[in-house]
């Protein structure tokens, strides 16, 4: 069995970790960073992910997709999605099944597909470090994610070529990383304010037993909202000063978003920062306009104060559900980059009556917890038992549109619960079971997860048939429901798939697309590497010819120049393949070897006239062009 990796699939940044012996280890990506921006961009030539995608966002805002986690498992007409449409420079569209999808370069993509690209980068990062293929993962989600969002995250893993062994809640993962070595019994609160979502979870830890007592949150509250407050403020101030509205200019908005994020981060460690965006727009007379503005920490806190206060309501609800008061909490663990903001730290301290624990890295602790859970599933981590809960109540719609709960929120999972219902009319031969998730009393006010029919019920007076409805929630928090007519024994069972959601066929197609893209990405990488090799070889060989060409016969020099010219010609052609460039590389290398041999021979015959050059020649016959370059360097010295 290969290594199981732990992935924190974040709204703003993602992170991957593995178990290295008894401790989790975060793996650096190809850019040398421990976290990767959760951004995917589409250009005319290629698809970019992570830091390269972020770098080009200002010049390609419509095709740079970020914060897609806020859309995953959501309907296009959700209030939160409608709000998000106004905040992002890319287009959010109807996926055809009512789900919120995104559009880039004229193509529609599901949030699961975009997430799969990010997961693919995490997979690649782990494979590069481990030197072996990775096929299994534990992926984290916000504790307050509903069934549709969890299922869509699992789909993303499948599209990325990963078998998702477990979906684990982010605060629970953070608690695992925090409490792995803790032997004493304690109650902890995990306050997780990330880029797009907020969760609070109350847990009891006791010598390897991690028991979640309650969880609450808001899947549309995070750093993105803080950034947009700054963006709106900057745009309003600019309009007051110059009379120009930047809200319709996608490129200007993307620049403001990057500036806002940078200013927000700086104001965590300083009390004032300057935002400077030259040439952000044009005046009525064609004059360039610049945005130069000072932003103080106090002003930022006034802009986002209500957002911070908003996070306190779920904290109150979580404590109430756990049946404890703030003073019963032994330790508060902060997770997510937003918790670095001094005002957030201050409000959390005030609410719980104690300073939060500072011993964990808020950006990495979730991935580390996922790696620990991966180690538990793999059998590498012993004596750790995790008991999580379902974040939202589950039930069905009954007569009058009432939401009848079968499983209450904060029930430990996995769990199973049955209840007997009956018909509402005489001789009713079928019932429709409509499954909902939420806390409102009327079914229509909650999130519908799906529906199915139980048919061929024998004619009987209303209230007589006995229909047993059973809910089953697995350890991933994913729901399956069955309905059984106790009179006939007829049963209908489904794993809930959201009324939109991705079908198996959709997922298979996306898996295939992802594999094709991976091949295309690999081919593109090979081409870039071959081009770089070719340009480097041309440069070093031309330098060698320039410095030593007079020491060899003209036919050798001519052969080298012809090989270089042919390779340059290949490099200038559109659509040239990596194989063609490699072939040209080989020709130049072979021709250059003759130059090296001739130079070495001339030096040997010349005795010790040029000791530095002779010494640079290795004693064996494995001459590579890098040594020609060294030879040239030595000659110059």
Curated annotation (Swiss-Prot):
The keyword Phosphoprotein applies. Keywords: ATP-binding, Chaperone, Nucleotide-binding, Phosphoprotein, Stress response. The keyword ATP-binding applies. Residues 621-637 have a biased composition (Acidic residues). Induction: By stress conditions e.g. heat shock. Residues 600-637 are annotated as: Disordered. NCBIfam families: PRK00290.1, PRK05183.1, prok_dnaK. HAMAP family: DnaK. Belongs to the heat shock protein 70 family. This is Chaperone protein DnaK. It comes from Ruegeria pomeroyi (strain ATCC 700808 / DSM 15171 / DSS-3) (Silicibacter pomeroyi).
